[in-house]
Swiss-Prot record:
GO BP term, example: mitotic cytokinesis
Polar residues bias (residue ranges): 147-156
Disruption phenotype: Cells fail to undergo cytokinesis in suspension culture and show osmoregulation defects. Late development is impaired in mutants lacking clc which produce misshapen projections rather than a fruiting body. Mutants lacking clc showed a reduction in the ability of clathrin to assemble onto membrane, though assembly of clathrin heavy chain triskelions was unaffected.
Biased composition (Basic and acidic residues): 89-115, 124-146
Listed name of the protein: Clathrin light chain
Organism encoding this protein: Dictyostelium discoideum (Social amoeba)
Region: Disordered, residue numbers: 44-156
InterPro entries assigned to the protein according to its UniProt record, in alphabetical order: Clathrin_L-chain
Function: Clathrin is the major protein of the polyhedral coat of coated pits and vesicles.
Assembly mode: Clathrin coats are formed from molecules containing 3 heavy chains and 3 light chains.
Family: Belongs to the clathrin light chain family.
């Protein structure tokens, strides 16, 4: 057989799927099936040479003449063979590894959940502390403003307005330029509108 890619010796392998076995190719008539758990089943097939010799004879004896042993149906009447020790050892080892992996994964998950809860608790406690401090600072500032306004130190309101702002602050490029507003407030303080 020639290969389109230039290799002369090409080995052809076939995989048999259940039901695809050619009984003429079997030597001893036994077929071994392996289920998903690694348990193998062995079934016996009919001898085709005897069936072909007696195919004109409709007697049941000719049908059963090539049959050696009892026929096991695929419906589940088969008796499972013992799993090979190496396969059993591998399956046990694999199962243990999967259980350990699952256990470690669950431990990591619980650890992440605990860390997330702790992080949320810290965030909320810091937030509450900041809110309380800001509230206290605002109350103190309002009290100082009230005492200044009731003390009567200023003769008119524009002086009190100018005292609330920082006249020495330099303009910040990120913020709007407030130099014009400061200039207006200083003029009003010096020459109040009557």
């Amino acid at each position: 057989m020639s290969d389109p890619f230039g290799e002369e010796n090409v080995e052809i392998t076939e995989e048999f799927v259940e039901g695809d076995i050619n009984e003429n190719d079997l030597i001893d008539g036994n077929v071994e099936y392996v289920d998903g758990n690694g348990i193998s089943f062995e079934t016996t097939t009919f001898d085709n040479s005897n069936n072909n010799n007696n195919n004109n004879n409709h007697n049941n004896n000719s049908y059963n003449s090539g049959f050696d042993g009892d026929l096991s149906s695929v419906d589940g009447d088969m008796k499972p063979k013992e799993t090979a020790p190496a396969m059993r050892e591998y399956l046990e080892k694999h199962e243990k590894e999967m259980q350990e992996k699952k256990k470690k994964s669950e431990e990591k998950r619980q650890k992440k959940i605990a860390e997330a809860k702790q992080s949320l608790d810290n965030f909320y406690s810091e937030r509450e502390a900041k809110k309380k401090t800001a509230l206290k600072n605002n109350r103190d500032h309002n009290k100082s403003l009230e005492t200044d306004s009731t003390s009567g130190n200023t003769t008119h309101t524009w002086e009190s307005v100018v005292s609330m702002i920082d006249l020495q602050a330099k303009p910040n490029p990120a913020n709007k330029d407030t130099s014009r507003m400061r200039e207006i407030l200083i003029r009003l303080k010096n020459q109040p509108i009557v």
